[in-house]
Amino acid sequence: DALLWEKDFRASHLGTMDMTFRDFMDVYAAEIKPRIREHSWIDKEYIINDEITPFFGDMRMNEIKPVDVVRWQNELIQYRNKDGEPYSPTYLRTINNQLAAIFNHPERYYDLPNNPVSKTTRMGSSKGSEMVFWTKEEYLKFSEAIMDKPLAFHAFEILYWTGIREGELLALTSADFDLDTAELSITKSYQCLRGVDTITDPKTPKSVRTISIPRFLNEEMREYLELRDDLKPHDRIFQMTKHFLSHEMKRGCEASGVKRIRIHDLRHSHVSLLINIGFSALAIAERVGHESVDITYRYAHLFPTKQKEMANALHELREE
């Protein structure tokens, strides 16, 4: 045991791939954690600790083979929780991507000769289940059912009519609203990290943006903020948890009879609303803080087809 400990100690300090997977995770954490957002590391760490290390922990990095990866994948594919439900295809893909990222690191920086993940097929799927969203009529029925709680009502009004992310909503202060120009500045995001309220940078550089809000929403927020005399300019308006929003979503759906969707689906609902009105992918992307190519890819089935118009235009051009 003493000789084995010395071997592991020397491997981890020299950065050789004769170390165990568990020891390499300490090296990986030290080198990756400073380079990514804190909540991204927490998500990554959760998957590593719960889904990856229990299987690979005592194996040596240079001895892990593609067949080991396949056996690990099969365990996760066959997993069922206490209700008999499997992991979703998108979660399986996320776990697989984390293992791939782990092995890409020593392959790139520590000359790991064989990357076992690159030789296997990926499990899961990058495409989630069918996109679900509310029409305007469904949202109005829902919002009427939660009007008795002004904090929840105004939170959902902003989510549906602006399409901002949940974390962006929870970080909003009254200073972010310019009620004279009816504009809202998105410059930060809220996360609860290890039980601590934390304000972080938005998800991507594109996420920093100023968006115009409809006049009715501007007036709703003007009236609401006037009532909230407890707030200072830089206090968070919506001092609530994500659980509170989910609970209010459930309550409103049960009271109104509207189908249940996720909080994030309100963002999809906003995008589909703008597509139906006739706005372009580029204009929508600027509003919601996405790349226009992402909007085109994710919502392509919602955009009206121009194929007939193209064919007719080509016919007329040929006949000239």
Predicted regions: what is each one?
Residues 90, 108, 151, 157, ...:
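C-terminal catalytic core of tyrosine-transesterase DNA break-rejoin enzymes
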Residues 122, 171-223, 235:
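Conserved tyrosine-mediated DNA breakage-rejoining catalytic core shared by Y-recombinases
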Residues 136-140, 189-192, 214-259:
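Active-site/catalytic core of tyrosine-dependent DNA strand-transfer enzymes
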